[in-house]
Amino acid sequence: MNMLNKKIYAEMYGPTVGDSVRLADTDLWVKIEKDFTIYGEEVKFGGGKVIRDGMGQGQMNNKECVDLVLTNAIIIDYWGVIKADIGINNGRIVGIGKSGNPDIQPGVTIYIGPGTEVISAEGKIVTAGGIDVHVHFICPQQIEEALSSGMTTLIGGGTGPTTGSNATTCTPGVWFISRMLQAADALPINIGFTGKGSSALPESLIEQIHAGAIGLKVHEDWGATPATIDCCLNVADNFDVQVSIHTDTLNESGFLETTISAIKNRTIHAYHVEGAGGGHSPDIIRICELNNVLPSSTNPTLPYTINTVDEHLDMMMVCHNLNCNLPEDIAFAESRIRRETIAAEDILHDLGALSMISSDSQAMGRIGETILRTWQTAHKMKLQRGSLLGDDQYNDNTRIKRYIAKYTINPAITHGIAHEVGSVEIGKLADLVLWSPVFFGVKPELIVKGGMIVSSVMGDPNASIPTPQPVYYRLMFGSYDLAKCATRMTFISQSSYDVGVVENLRLNSLIGISKRCRNIKKDHMINNNLKPVMEVDPQTYEVRANGELLVCEPVSVVPMSQRYFLF
């Protein structure tokens, strides 16, 4: 058999087992662990290429062949780094393996026929669409920003640029939940809305769950007292929905121990652990030692840089409706911003003690930068802490699997939607992001939503080819009209589905049910389930995990930044 040299092979079909690929301009390298394609039987589309009738394309009908195949993709997910073809049917992933024509090719598991469309992924990286579970729905324009960064699912609350939504991720009450569910039908992205959980009596919380809320949010700005926490969790346990909490920064109704006692070992998603977004000052970070708490942090403090602290005071004043002329408001804001705990946040993510990363969109966070800042943090930690156990030169797979899980599978597990989204696995919605390695984590090439491209880098529509400038992200056919509703999903509670919310509101989108939220523990957080014994010095704010002082320096330069955003 004539063999291609590695350079020519990689240029034609992409890298294979044992090859390493650099991620953007970081110091992170991914190494391919397995190749499902077969040497000499690879399929590729184009003039003079393999996917032609009677060659790599068979004559099967629609029932036998896939609707869409991504060829020779490098798949990066929490479960591994492989090279494979990806088959999609009816908007869902149906195959990860070897595509082609089974009549003449060996080992074919994904059938290509006359009804099959192709996305050439040779040399490209495919990841699951990101999941942001800390979204303030302040304006609908966020959706395009999120999509063009690689996000395909948003969970949070809000009703637009109201004072309440600027500060909290709550869509309060039956009327607003109904209107936001109807609005979501027009948005080409998966969405779930969290209702307001700050109530010491259950009736209004139950109403919101019946109205279609995917879960509830307890926030200090509405009240995060022991009574509201206990009531909200009681309701959540009865209806199998998740509770997210932003705890009491001022310690007015109790300290961290008071909140932990009110939680009573029940499952809860804790926001802002740590960062500078709020929560019991100064030791909310200790909550990541508990098995019943699923901890996340937000992107404005990631990674810790020389500018992180300075930018936060003004952000805090605006988002939480504070007055810069009132000393008590200044003191409130400053109590949240601590260099020591912000630095510890980076390290705890690298240890796998913090399980998720989200945005806090337009409310002290940036909806288009969650993926970007996740990989900047991973890069910073590799430089400052070295390779993780199991990694070596040109192989950071352990660290990469840890960090990608923070914005894909773990948020999905936390909010009971992992049966639908969160990973590149058979049976799940085909929410996939295609990246050129040099732009990985920064600017995706195209975003597939429910099996159809919804957003892509695109050149001048009047040009003779797709690539001439100006080149920027544009919404594609999958984001329009009924196609959008057939490829996006609205997530609601089981009880709201049972009482007929979908029919009553005339929702047209795919419907996903949040389920199995209440028995999840931190042990279920994939690649991110460390539960260290935490200590925080109340005077110096020094943070220790299992007795080790968590200290890292702020960086003055980060990758994936200016060289990618000159234009």
From Swiss-Prot:
PTM characteristics: Carboxylation allows a single lysine to coordinate two nickel ions.
Hydrolase among keywords: yes
All copies of domain Urease, residue ranges: 129-567
EC number: 3.5.1.5
Protein's recorded name: Urease subunit alpha
Listed pathway(s): Nitrogen metabolism; urea degradation; CO(2) and NH(3) from urea (urease route): step 1/1
Modified residues (N6-carboxylysine): K217
Residues binding Ni(2+) 2: K217, H246, H272
Enzymatic reactions: urea + 2 H2O + H(+) = hydrogencarbonate + 2 NH4(+)
Single GO molecular function: urease activity
HAMAP family: Urease_alpha
Binding site for Ni(2+) 1: H134, H136, K217, D360
Co-factor note (free text): Binds 2 nickel ions per subunit.
Binding positions (substrate): H219
Compartments, record wording: Cytoplasm
Pfam families: Amidohydro_1, Urease_alpha
Entries under NCBIfam families matching the protein: PRK13207.1, urease_alph
Assembly and interaction partners: Heterotrimer of UreA (gamma), UreB (beta) and UreC (alpha) subunits. Three heterotrimers associate to form the active enzyme.
Protein family: Belongs to the metallo-dependent hydrolases superfamily. Urease alpha subunit family.
Keywords, alphabetical: Cytoplasm, Hydrolase, Metal-binding, Nickel
Top-level EC class as recorded in UniProt: hydrolase
